[in-house]
Amino acid sequence: MAELSANYNYLENEPKWQDDWQKKNIYQWNSTLPKDKTFIVDPPPPTVSGDLHIGHAMSFIQLDCIVRYQRMLGKNIFFPIGFDDNGLPTERFVEKIKNVRASNIARPDFIKMCQEVVIAKEGEFCKFLNAIGLSVDWSLKYQTISSLSCKISQMSFLDLVNKNQVYRNHQPVLWDCIDQTALSQADVEDKERITSMYYIAFAVMNSELKVQIATTRPEMLPACCAIFFNPNDIRYQHLHNQFAITPLFKSVVPILAEETVDINKGSGLVMCCTFGDTKDVAWWRKHNLPTRIIIDYYGKVKPLDFTVSSQNQEKFTEYYNQITGLKIAQARNKVVELLHHNQLIIKQEQISQTVKQAERSGAILEIIMAPQWFIKVVEHKDALLQKSQELEWYPKSMKIKLDNWINSLAWDWCISRQRYFGIPFPVWYSKREGEEGKIIFADISQLPVDPLYDLPAGYSKDEVIPDSDVMDTWATSSLSPQLSSHGISSNLTIDSTRHNQLFPADLRSQAHEIIRTWTFYTIVKSYLHQNSLPWSKIMISGWCLADDRKKMSKSKGNIILPTELIKRYGADAVRYWALTSQLGHDCVVSEQVIGIGKKLVNKLWNAARFILQHITGKLTAEFLISAKHCVEKKVISCTTDLWMLSKLQDTVNNTSNLLNNYEYASARLYVEEFFLKDFCDNYLELVKSRIYDHSSEYQKSAIYSVFWGLKTILELFAPFVPFITEELYAAIYQSNNLCNGSIHSSNKWPLAQNFYNDELILTTGNLAINILTLVRKSKSARKLSVKAPISLLQVKYDSDSYQQLPSDLVDDLKLVTNSNEFSIVTNFTTIDDLITGDGITVNIVYPGSMKHEC
């Protein structure tokens, strides 16, 4: 039998097991087993937009703990890993590290550059995920930019076209002037800023009246198409259906009632421009207002290309020409200057304002008109809320985030992006005479296609215009369950057998900040394609916080790379930290907690070394059979051993229940407390003397119990700290041919019914632990060694109840406390040190101490 070294070398052992698990295909999915025997997970494909940090490690480790548990239960595991390596986030990353702008180089050259970067970065990602002990099946790896993913994503698009759930329209879109692309509602975040509110004088047509309109965007005056007031605002009811004259530009615009106008904001009158914000869009649609677009794709005032009803067309053109070509902020300053010059600004005040900002570039968004592809979501809000209700949420509190997002939806999902490195739309536009502008869709049999290089059947190159846009990256990553199943729905697949085996999945794991994107879009796609949920359960992790308690993110530059932490403490210690955070709760990176994890790993090693030292020469097949028989057939003879096995049964039972509900943090704590307190601090101390004593009739009971207890502890810890548990399991059990396979193999989870359980034994054993605790407290107070002798140890119950302890338990207590005599009494005779706790009083008489008679 191999001996364990004095210290555990994680730097040597962790890479060893990473290689071993892969070589032996420990985590391989078995495609021959049916769906009901398989646990299918849909993990987040990391975005190739920078380094993976400790926050990614936290989320993946939490999922991996659940996956390892399910595998040990006996489930066939489908645990893929994907990389979201297309779209705007990846493009921005490539632009940054290559110091280029995609718009300034040839499209093929930029795409090639992106491909080279993602291949290198994904190699780093794989090393990272291996280092933290992720139990994925690497043969299931996918990339969202791959040919297969492109085919599946384009299949999804065409299926939604056929189901009339996709449309193309020239309509208002959220526009990022930095990245030069349309964005969806989910790509946007709110930004608070201080700005100026200008109260501007408008004339009322055919009247001497002047009205004030408050706006933060005076540069939009030439795009003004109406004035609104709340119909309940008595100040302006007399103006209904009259006309206002815009300052400077002298446009004639109607004054209309609109119940969504905030009476208390500004003057209560508001101008509607095309388009200053999303309210303008809603009012423009509702009231069928004219369109006057003045902002171009670059965030500048475009040349005048529309006509308006102005009382002075010459002045309109004169003032407009003064702002043409200016950036928005410059145009605003110029219009304010002109308004001041004409004494049209009544007052100006500083306000706090919330504006829409691009999540990636940070650009303040504009709203422009552009032809884009959209997926219908607004009309499905009720159905999507029902799907949210059907989904099992862990924790339940996260459901409201999705519900609130669905309820807030005002726009359909814009999936067009005016970028380069993404999934192309399988679309062309006809130039053929008589069908100019006709949309031509690829046939599914052609997929994947790139319309820039491929042609639709029956058309020549000169007869079509390719759609040069690419899809929103979420349009593909939202298909992550289908990217694994190789099918869109049961009626549209690449591999129908595989799709039916894997779709829908069992569990989605992700962080809460992408509920409005990845969760929502995946549910949308699954609902529209197959009228089902993509998975039955979803577990949501919290944020990983930096030392300043701010969310850790690549964009904020406050990330902590786990490489140094793993080198300093080991991957198991980092996993320990990640599994201290309750599901859905934010977790601060704490080297102190990681250090506690390292101490736990060392404690496991040292406990195993101690046990091994005392069963040397006994580890034979017969020994294993005898130990298994004695434990599982409940024929262990000593009370202390039975108490430990009863506590172990409780631990197995409670840990299983907690992990079944994805409460990994509570499960880890339960196992840890049993190991440290019950097993190491108390049980091993109680039985240590019996293990040493070869003449004791109870030695075999102790050795069998210790041996089986350690094996079970390693199995319970395996989902949490896989490297140390595998090392010890291999050294003690595999190397002696006592167990087959990895501890992380199928059917290695302990069964609660295989352990002794007796409430009386538990009560009796707990009493013994209470006595031991009080003795330790007494010796500590007297600054005595734990081995200090005791002449007389007496126990008196505080209540009328009276219970003698079994003689074998008394023997263990006397040995561990080094007591000459032990008794349970109703009254003390000689008193030395009285100490009380948990329903009992203990009298401890030390040799040579001052004592008195009662």
UniProtKB/Swiss-Prot annotation:
Coiled coil: none annotated. It is found in: Cytoplasm. PROSITE patterns: AA_TRNA_LIGASE_I (PS00178). It holds the Pfam family Anticodon_1. GO terms for molecular function: aminoacyl-tRNA deacylase activity; ATP binding; valine-tRNA ligase activity. CDD domains: Anticodon_Ia_Val. A motif ('HIGH' region) lies at residues 46-56. It comes from the Bacteria. It is an enzyme of class 6 (ligase). InterPro entries: aa-tRNA-synth_I_CS, aa-tRNA-synth_Ia, Anticodon_Ia_Val, M/V/L/I-tRNA-synth_anticd-bd, Rossmann-like_a/b/a_fold, tRNAsynth_Ia_anticodon-bd, Val/Leu/Ile-tRNA-synth_edit, Valine-tRNA_ligase_type_2. A motif ('KMSKS' region) lies at residues 551-555. GO terms for cellular component: cytosol. Belongs to the class-I aminoacyl-tRNA synthetase family. ValS type 2 subfamily. Monomer. ValRS has two distinct active sites: one for aminoacylation and one for editing. The misactivated threonine is translocated from the active site to the editing site. Catalyzes the attachment of valine to tRNA(Val). As ValRS can inadvertently accommodate and process structurally similar amino acids such as threonine, to avoid such errors, it has a 'posttransfer' editing activity that hydrolyzes mischarged Thr-tRNA(Val) in a tRNA-dependent manner. This is Valine--tRNA ligase.
